[in-house]
From Swiss-Prot:
This is Tryptophan synthase beta chain. It comes from the Bacteria. It comes from Lacticaseibacillus paracasei (strain ATCC 334 / BCRC 17002 / CCUG 31169 / CIP 107868 / KCTC 3260 / NRRL B-441) (Lactobacillus paracasei). Belongs to the TrpB family. Tetramer of two alpha and two beta chains.
Length: 406
């Protein structure tokens, strides 16, 4: 049997980014299903009825539009650029993940699927998928690396509470990449009634495009909101990057505005120059994994290296193909933030703004802390808070040596 990482079929230019990123590198057993998903997405994405159904759920269920919040205390404390926070943490389920899940679940419904499966790292995508499955009366199974089930026990219980079955994945490094492998294997073995709700802007086409499409609501809103508040574009948009869904959603509406600097913040872990990092764009090389050509952390033989971050949502050994292309073309800049810097930012934003933000988002906040003082007071940064930090409080306390009862 062919493995899921074996190149059995390539796409044409469809699903390609930059010179050669993206594509479809998957076993033929999944090609027919991918073609169905691609057709459904292309047929429905601009369909007025589908758009109305999607918008109704985003507004009346997910609590959109999310706030664009002026972080006055941070702005004054850092003494430079004006800082606005795009509050995806205020969405139903507490993160940006629900934007994409609603869209994909509606596609699944139109395709007649009865069962949703998904991978999850920090658990937020799993929670969002379980939530929408409950709403739509669909079965749901979530695959999560055992390392992540151990450090995100609250989200595991939350998924089970919502009616999902959670599978701890014990193969490989037992983290997000292994959860993706397990979910792909499950989809290949049972695609007749099952839809794979991929949570990040990764995987074979059309998933990166589809995830970007459903997450672009973040930047579509922020552009309109800043126009209403300041009557101008931001100078910089900052978002954390694992696989890259919240970042591509945060960048989407600005990619064609060259005056707007786009900054993706990766997890440097213990340091970009150590072997305990997940800074894929800075450290990775071109390869093929999880059905796409992109940048990956890999050895000379093309075997995927283990990656590390304090953040379960950022320790993916690759990055979405559009991010790889944006980096290659110089349209976006990607920087690394260490565990220590992210933990400091977790405390900083809590004390400055009264917001407990996800440790993933705090990587972006840590970069804002560095860059804002170097910018003029009439410049504007939009930083996306991809999620809330309730899930991280116990692990951050432990990291700091504080004993708390989870």
């Amino acid at each position: 049997m062919k493995t899921l990482n074996e190149t059995t079929q390539q796409s044409t230019r469809a699903g390609r980014y930059g010179k050669d990123f993206g594509g479809q590198y998957i076993p033929e057993t999944l090609m027919t299903e991918l073609e169905k998903v691609t057709k459904a997405f292309n047929d429905l994405k601009d369909n007025p009825e589908f758009k109305a159904e999607l918008n109704d759920l985003l507004v009346n269920y997910a609590n959109r539009p999310s706030l664009l919040y002026y972080a006055k205390n941070m702005t004054e404390d850092l003494g430079g650029a004006k800082i606005y926070l795009k509050r995806e943490d205020l969405n139903h389920t507490g993160a940006h993940k629900i934007n994409n899940v609603i869209g994909q679940a509606l596609l699944a419904k139109h395709l007649g699927k009865k069962r949703l499966i998904a991978e999850t790292g920090a658990g937020q995508h799993g929670v969002a998928t379980a939530t929408i499955a409950a709403l739509m009366g669909m079965d749901c199974e979530i695959f999560m690396g055992k390392e992540d089930t151990d450090r995100q026990k609250l989200n595991v219980y939350r998924m089970e509470l919502l009616g999902a079955k959670v599978h701890p994945v014990t193969s490989g490094s037992m983290v997000l990449k292994d959860a993706v492998n397990a979910t792909l294997q499950e989809w290949a073995s049972r695609s007749d009634d099952t839809f794979y709700v991929l949570g990040s802007a990764v995987g074979p086409a059309p998933f990166p495009e589809m995830v970007k499409h459903f997450q672009s609501v973040i930047s579509t809103e922020s552009k309109q909101q800043l126009q209403a508040k300041e009557a101008r574009l931001p100078d910089m948009v900052v978002a954390c990057v694992g696989g890259g869904s919240n970042a591509i959603g945060s960048f989407a509406a600005y990619i064609d505005d060259p005056s707007v600097q786009l900054v993706g913040v990766e997890a440097a872990g213990k340091g970009v120059d150590t072997d305990r990092t997940a800074a894929t764009i800075e450290r990775g090389s071109v390869g093929i994994f999880h059905g796409m050509k992109s940048l990956f952390m890999q050895n000379e033989d093309g075997q995927i290296d283990p990656v590390y971050s304090i953040s379960a949502g950022l320790d993916y050994p690759g990055v979405g193909p559009e991010h790889a292309a944006l980096a290659q073309e110089g349209r976006a800049q990607y920087v690394g933030i260490t565990d220590d810097e992210a933990v400091e930012a977790f405390t900083y934003i809590a004390k400055q703004e009264g917001i407990v933000a996800a440790i993933e988002s705090c990587h972006a906040i840590a970069y804002v802390e560095k860059i804002a003082p170097q910018m003029a007071k009439d410049q504007i940064i939009i930083c996306t808070l991809s999620g809330r930090g309730d899930k991280d409080v116990a692990s951050i306390a432990k990291y700091k040596g504080v004993d708390v009862d989870e």
